[in-house]
Amino acid sequence: MELEDILNAREGDKLFLLGNEATVRAAIESGVGVASTYPGTPSSEIGNVLSGIAKRAGMYFEFSVNEKVALEVAAAAAASGVRSFTFMKHVGLNVASDSFMSTAYTGVRAGMVVLTADDPSMFSSQNEQDNRHYARLACLPLLEPSDPQEVLEFMNHAFELSEDYGLPVLLRTTTRVSHMRGVVEVGSRMREPSEGFFRKDPERFVPVPATARVMHRKLVDKMKELRIRADESELNRVFNGGSDSELGVVASGGAFNYVYDALESLGLELPVLKLGFTYPFPAGLVEEFLSGLKRVLVVEEVDPIMEREVLAVAGSARLDLDVHGKLDGTLPEIYEYNEDILRKAISGLTGAPSVERECDVPDIPERPPSLCPGCPHRAVYYAVRRAADELELSGDEIIFPTDIGCYTLGIEPPYSAADYLLSMGSSIGTSCGFSAATTQRIVSFIGDSTFFHAGIPPLINAVHNKQRFVLVVLDNRTTAMTGGQPHPGLPVDGMGDEAPEISIEEIVRASGVEFVETVNPMNIKRTSETVKRALEHESVAVVISKYPCMLSSGAVRGRPMAVDGEKCDLCLECIRDLACPAMVTREGEVFIDPLKCRGCSVCLQICPAGAIKPEGKG
């Protein structure tokens, strides 16, 4: 969808939007003045779109250094009377959770929406956590849209709800809702962004113990009012209410879509309660829905949160009712759902014949994820492996903690340079632990954006506590895996304006690291020699690999490489140890695809026979 259409569409216009794009339109309609994020799939497109149109919409937008900062930026804006919107992937809310929990106590003066993009089945994440738990933990209202139209409507509703109760509102999407595309009828711009002014009120905004106790009581009282609001909310709807079936369905979020499709394919009309306002749980509405049923199927992704609520409602009301879902094995406990799963479950409960869809899928070769041709990370992994081999460090003698980013693909052979991963920035913290607990050598990897996000405190910890390991900072001049967003190490901000460029090398030196060297990873010999010296250093050593991502605007494409068949002795070191996707064996010969080759020349440097040269050179 063109950015101009999202920005300039008029009330009643219909746009074909991603769920993520619909959030941007909602932010414009609701008069958001400040928006912030740290990029992370499946929420990344929101920031990409906002980056392109925020200034023209009269909105301030930033790619914050991490999610905690992003939430704090939004919270302060909302406390100043400016509507704010912060968004992040599900694990990002872990990073922001300290301040997120406190915003429930302090509240807001203008609407504040926190979007969490959950990732059932972990398509791009290290875990499958269900962030609906955060609403309960913080005592904040939770809305769950099912499609792009609802994303727009629910988000606009969330700002009104936020201001009615002076609380942030959590909006939960999932990967399919974020990346689903649908027709969205847009509304009008209800208000324009306004300039804020912070009126001091320490008893409200400074939660020391004495004031926090008062804040908590007020929050509990607000939740009592919100329970009534949830019971009466128009975001909760009953479908097929006239059905006389003894089996009903309670569903929320993207999972509702699978229920709808499954019922349609089975030709059934079961009563369905679709919950959009899911916390506080609308117990009164649910009890009313359950009262005419003998059985109910609860459909949700990922944890059985609503199912336990339904069980509690049924038990409290002493309803003679069987509750089916995850807990009794009717539905899978984990991963995202689909129409087939729901059709099978409903068929099993109703006895309706389930029509299995036949799909003739041809066998295709496996395509494991791979670093791009010319990726500087590949060169680094090769150089590190060469340095380790020359120092006779192999197998369990050397540990490779890694981090979140494209370079996590270092787990794949032939590099096999990813042994331990927890979260953003964990490569450095876990290196401290391995250094303290073992005598094994350690080389850890972290990206440039991840270093700014969460790498600086553990690096200071490492220096202060006299740990010993090598840290390789993979500075490819962008936040690559999520789409090439800027970070503080670049001279541009989230709205495309010129900004101060923060030097990673200067930060590392200021942290007390004595061994700091910056290398061009495409120079294999120098990079390998630098890593060897770093491994021999007696304390923390940092090697900064600085070279632009091949997908970025700053990348330079060189002349493609070619193989001299007369010189090539088919040792296959280039295929076996470098594993560049541009290099293949064809009819018993090594071949470099000129359309894929980026001309980085790494293969030329490592060929023992000197059989690789720039294309067209004799």
From Swiss-Prot:
Q: Which cofactor does it need?
A: [4Fe-4S] cluster
Q: Could you tell me what the cofactor note in this record states? A: Binds 2 [4Fe-4S] clusters. In this family the first cluster has a non-standard and varying [4Fe-4S] binding motif CX(2)CX(2)CX(4-5)CP.
Q: Which domain of life is it from?
A: Archaea
Record domain 4Fe-4S ferredoxin-type: where: 558-587, 588-617
What chemistry does it catalyse, as a reaction equation?
Answer: indole-3-pyruvate + 2 oxidized [2Fe-2S]-[ferredoxin] + CoA = (indol-3-yl)acetyl-CoA + 2 reduced [2Fe-2S]-[ferredoxin] + CO2 + H(+)
EC numbers listed for it are: 1.2.7.8
- Which GO molecular function annotation, any one, does this entry have? indolepyruvate ferredoxin oxidoreductase activity
By its UniProt entry, which Pfam families does this protein fall under? Answer: Fer4 (PF00037), POR_N (PF01855), TPP_enzyme_C (PF02775)
Q: Where does [4Fe-4S] cluster 2 bind?
A: C580, C597, C600, C603
Binding residues for [4Fe-4S] cluster 1, per the UniProt record? C568, C571, C574, C607
GO BP: any one term? sulfur compound biosynthetic process
Sorted alphabetically, the keyword list is:
4Fe-4S, Electron transport, Iron, Iron-sulfur, Metal-binding, Oxidoreductase, Repeat, Transport
Gene3D superfamilies, A to Z: 3.30.70.20, 3.40.50.920, 3.40.50.970
Complex formation: Heterodimer of the IorA and IorB subunits.
**Its function?**
Catalyzes the ferredoxin-dependent oxidative decarboxylation of arylpyruvates.
User: What is the name of this protein?
Assistant: Indolepyruvate oxidoreductase subunit IorA
- Give the lineage: Archaea, Methanobacteriati, Methanobacteriota, Methanomada group, Methanobacteria
Encoding gene (name): iorA
